[in-house]
């Protein structure tokens, strides 16, 4: 089975990341912040006939090549691929967020986040939440 590869440098350029890339918490935090500052949450495709494709190559083309944003499944999906290419151990999981204005949780499977394992510790990473209160660094 062929391992998918991406142009990692092009992705790092897209998010404006410069400097050393290593499998560390400090690097993960910087990658997360740079991604959030450069790639917007957007759901413009909901208003078109464009079919959502969640394969790595399609997400990369949308976010990196075409300089678009996306929703949580697209943003976290593409970011997980970048992290894997850099050597991080990543799991993709379903999540629910709490909406304080409505006083309730969102629907099950309505959100997607990443779990990154570093030195036997697990960190929640989310670059795909369209809200100002989105965590800007990994949460242990």
Residue map of PLM features:
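Secondary-structure boundary elements
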Residues: 2-67
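Hydrophobic/aromatic-rich core segments of domains that either
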Residues: 77, 81-140
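Generic preference for flexible, low-structure residues
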Residues: 27-28, 44-47, 51, 55-60, ...
């Amino acid at each position: 089975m062929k391992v998918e590869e991406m142009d990692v440098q092009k992705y790092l350029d897209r998010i404006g990341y410069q400097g050393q890339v290593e499998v560390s918490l400090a690097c993960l935090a910087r990658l997360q912040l740079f991604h959030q500052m450069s790639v917007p949450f957007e759901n413009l495709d909901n208003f078109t006939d464009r079919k959502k494709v969640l394969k790595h190559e399609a997400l990369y083309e949308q976010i990196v090549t075409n300089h678009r944003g996306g929703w949580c499944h697209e943003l976290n999906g593409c970011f997980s691929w970048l992290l894997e290419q850099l050597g991080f151990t990543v799991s993709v999981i379903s999540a629910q967020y709490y909406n304080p204005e409505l006083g309730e949780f969102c629907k099950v499977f309505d959100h997607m986040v990443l779990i990154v394992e570093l030195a036997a510790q697990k960190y929640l990473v989310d670059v795909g939440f369209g809200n100002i209160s989105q965590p800007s660094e990994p949460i242990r």
